[in-house]
Amino acid sequence: MIRLSPSRTLKALLTCAMLCFGALSHAQQLFRVTAIPDESPTELARKAAPLLKYLEAKLGAKVEFTPVTDYAAAVEALVNKKVDMAWFGGFTFVQANVRSGGKVIPIVQREEDERFRSVFITSDDAIKSLVDLKGKDLSFGSQSSTSGHLMPRSFLLQAGLNPDKDFRRVAYSGAHDATIAAVASGKVQAGALNISVWEKFVTDKKFDAGKVRVFFTTPPYFDYNWTVHADMPAAQREKLTQAFLSLSRDTTEGKEILDLQRATRFVPSKVDNYKGIEAAGRSAGLL
């Protein structure tokens, strides 16, 4: 039998305690996630719950959703490292990238986000094309929304309509579902929003489809992504990326998460995907 001196025994015990404490601390690490509030808080929480549980298992850390009040707060939260990962629209990513001096990294996006679109909706039978909007009331979503403001504004400008001059009134509802509600209730005659929220409302029959219809669908553009701060360790960033890329519709868990995220699958993303949106933002005077 090997006998240790009291000093060596104490040293061994302290080493063991430090290792155990380190393992415990690692297990109790908090990984914070946020998302732009492009839908109601209850809907965002419902969509996030299974994904957070999945990420907890993959990362070996407690994953917590941190809600924010507006798009700007989501940008500031990631730029200032108050959260570890954020769900951004294309334009909010650009804002975060500019605000941080290039210190944020888009890791994944849905396959759908490689060719995302917006829709213009109306309850007015006389509106059949974008040019028919002249002199009407129009609602965008948030001013920082890619699919609910920036890209619809860009396509209006391409059609020869200046939202700041050619409409009777321009409103900002703050969220895609709120835009649908504004059009359905008659508060505005038309609205622009994210196609995936529109399709979900149609599928779930959340409004009278006989009253509100799509009259214009935009050409495709890059949109949403999951973004992290560049200071995140490369190993953790890779683990996180692989967790998303591993999601599969072949498993019950994967199908549930992908359905809630309205995704076929997740694919790698990169900064260059959003150069077009950055150019549109600068052209519109929003950057």
What residue ranges belong to the model's regions?
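Bacterial N-terminal signal peptides that target proteins for export
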Residues: 2-14
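N-terminal signal peptide c-region/cleavage motif recognized by signal peptidases
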Residues: 22-24
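An extracytoplasmic/periplasmic, membrane-proximal ligand-sensing/linker region
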Residues: 28-35, 39-50, 221-223, 227-287
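Extracytoplasmic small-molecule ligand-binding "clamshell" domains
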Residues: 28-92
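Short coil/turn segments
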Residues: 38-41, 45, 112, 121-127, ...
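Short helices/loops that flank or line small-molecule/ion binding pockets
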Residues: 72-86, 99-100, 131-134, 175-196
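Acidic, polar ligand-binding/catalytic clefts
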Residues: 76-132
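Pocket-lining segment of extracytoplasmic ligand-binding domains
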Residues: 126, 136-235
